[in-house]
Amino acid sequence: MVLSPADKTNVKAAWDKVGGHAGDYGAEALERMFLSFPTTKTYFPHFSDLSHGSAQVKAHGKKVGDALNNAVGHMDDLPTALSALSDLHAHKLRVDPVNFKLLSHCLLVTLACHHPAEFTPAVHASLDKFLANVSTVLVSKYR
């Protein structure tokens, strides 16, 4: 899905609002995903604690946030920016591709909860397209 110039502007503006909270929002989205889609927990057998506030979930949330910061900064070349992450998830972790869509949805909900005034239909659509592109790149090495 091609991001229009307006989409890119919306994504950058929304992500600017996230600021230094990307890791916190990543952790919150993971917690939301674990609660809403419990089968996703199976990809984290090495985590001893998946509860709210878990240090392991916070650490992984920071990784998610950092990856999204990188993606926002490289919207015009996501395949290159996310290549190593795609390899990791496809070949080592073997995460079911549907889980990227689930996490994307949970991230949208998290952003809407924290920034309701800024989460307009246009921003929602742009973020959804952006996260769909990120998901597509992350599953590209599965083939």
Curated annotation (Swiss-Prot):
The keyword Transport applies. The modification N6-succinyllysine is found at K8, K12, K17, K41. Transmembrane segments: none annotated. O2 binds at H60. GO terms for biological process: hydrogen peroxide catabolic process. Residues 2-143 form the Globin domain. InterPro entries: Globin (IPR000971), Globin-like_sf (IPR009050), Globin/Proto (IPR012292), Hemoglobin_a-typ (IPR002338), Hemoglobin_oxygen_transport (IPR050056), Hemoglobin_pi (IPR002339). The keyword Repressor does not apply. Disulfide bonds: none annotated. One of its GO terms (cellular component) is hemoglobin complex. Keywords: Acetylation, Heme, Iron, Metal-binding, Oxygen transport, Phosphoprotein, Transport. Red blood cells. The modification N6-acetyllysine is found at K17. Heterotetramer of two alpha chains and two beta chains. Belongs to the globin family. Involved in oxygen transport from the lung to the various peripheral tissues. This is Hemoglobin subunit alpha. It comes from Pipistrellus abramus (Japanese pipistrelle). The gene is HBA.
